Amino acid sequence: MKKSLQIGYLITILLIFFVPGLLFVSGKGKSAPDTEENRTLSAMPKLEASTYRVFPTQFEDYFNDHLPLKDQLVFANSYLDYRFFHSSSSDQVVVGKNGWLFYTGTQQGDEAQMKDYLGENLYTEEELQTLASKLNQAAADFQKRGAHLTFVFNPNKSRIYADQMPAAYGKPAENYRLKQVVQYLKANTKLDIVDTTDVLADYHKKNLQNQIYFKYDTHWNSFGSYIATGLLAQGLKRSLPSPDAVSIQDGKHPVYDLARMLHLQDILTEDPAPIVSGYTDRTYESQMSGEGAEIMIHGSCASPEADARKLLLIGDSYGTFMFRFLATEFAQTTYCHYSQYHRDVLEAEKPQEVVFELVERNLSLLNSFSIDRAFPQ
């Protein structure tokens, strides 16, 4: 029996190693042209006198792209890593307790989410002084054009769900960059700063049954966003009902971005996607333009109970969650992704209130923020 099992394992391993190669040579079972990587697949290189030096590398790229059963093998590897070894097949994702996924934050800019968590990317005193000076200047420039500026900072998922982080990372640092920036700006400037960390952490601690961030995604869910937007609304002299006073229904589950990074988006689907209702009787109409990072959303609320001020929300993807709750509070609300913001947007919208929103991992974008742009040139 034991010998038969060993032979079975050996045959399985041989099939895994040799079947894709045999199919590749025979030209059968080629991978589909559409991949999760969203790029053009490598073409078969030509072996010529002028290309013989680079041919091996080019052929390797072609082989990797067109290997038969590639997608199935990638899926199998990711599934085994996640389900049985509680590890990640991607350097962009770590697997935490109870199957929770966390983003390592290294895809763009100087994101360093694990350094945020461990407090390893603190600013120096000089850097804080420079940052405060820049933001003071930005607020003054907006004020000259009749717009009051508010900053709102939202915590990383690992900050709120530290209880689900891998044990190897330990507890989150007591002092970390977001906390450092907020404390410095509040102590040394008159800027309006809203930090939603404490209100979200307190809610999670007292209400473990209500999930406020997605398990398989980098983002908070709609309910978590509602809690945070309630705090922002107070800073804008508006108010939203208590989280305990609203209704929550389970909505359509999105494709979770961290699950997609592991090629497991088709099986990691059991993750609450709450829809919040009952917080207002007011409605709004919206128009959306652009896609992805180029998205802009314009909302208008005709209710006489809506604030007559025009609001411009400049932010990252977390801001899109906040938009729907703000859109019923103001007569006109516009969301603009930070990468698309420039002075022309301000001149076109002519808001009385401007909110610059960032999730913790994007905090370094503060160094680039001005009335002219919110993204490095």
Regions found by a protein language model. Give the residues of each.
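Extracellular glycan-modifying ectodomains
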Residues: M1-Q377
